[in-house]
Amino acid sequence: MAEKQTAKRNRREEILQSLALMLESSDGSQRITTAKLAASVGVSEAALYRHFPSKTRMFDSLIEFIEDSLITRINLILKDEKDTSARLRLIVLLILGFGERNPGLTRILTGHALMFEQDRLQGRINQLFERIEAQLRQVLREKRMREGEGYATDETLLASQLLAFCEGMLSRFVRSEFKYRPTDDFDARWPLVAAQLQ
């Protein structure tokens, strides 16, 4: 029985990995059908549906992975790092690095892969970005408590500016067909971004 569950879990992971790879390839800029996905995995469409009730559920699973990966790591940064500037830099670098290491998932983050899918999926991505923005805002607000002085500019504006930078770099990565990596020249870009944090 345990072997059957493991085999089923492995097949589910294989399906999700194939979907992510298809999103990374030129197929990712078009609608991905279950027929194409089944062919990529080497199974029938019926076999896909034994593991996932719908393609939407497959995307849900990928979004769950994105959420878990980013939020868990952001929480680790907040636990381990106390300096506000370092926290912000590490969170931004985390988001950009995650996108760079997972190009197919970056198409989901930017919404490109979800254009042909249910609106609910885009809503989940919107919620994820709202959670990240809220965490950035909290880090910015905590500066006053941690370091004795805050920012002259409203923390809501600063948090949205940081997130807009991340979203812009991820969109550029997707638009360039993954040519312009989000972390390229990060050490030169970060001082420009950090200068806005006044």
Swiss-Prot record:
The keyword Cytoplasm belongs to this UniProt entry's keyword annotation: yes
Coiled coil stretches, renumbered: 117-144
Cited Pfam families: SlmA-like_C, TetR_N
Any one Gene Ontology molecular-function term assigned to this protein's record: transcription cis-regulatory region binding
GO biological process, one term: cell division
Residue ranges of DNA binding: 33-52
InterPro entries in alphabetical order: DNA-bd_HTH_TetR-type_CS, Homeodomain-like_sf, HTH-type_TetR-like_transc_reg, HTH_TetR, NO_SlmA, SlmA-like_C, Tet_transcr_reg_TetR-rel_C_sf
Assembly and interaction partners: Homodimer. Interacts with FtsZ.
Protein name (record): Nucleoid occlusion factor SlmA
Protein's gene: slmA
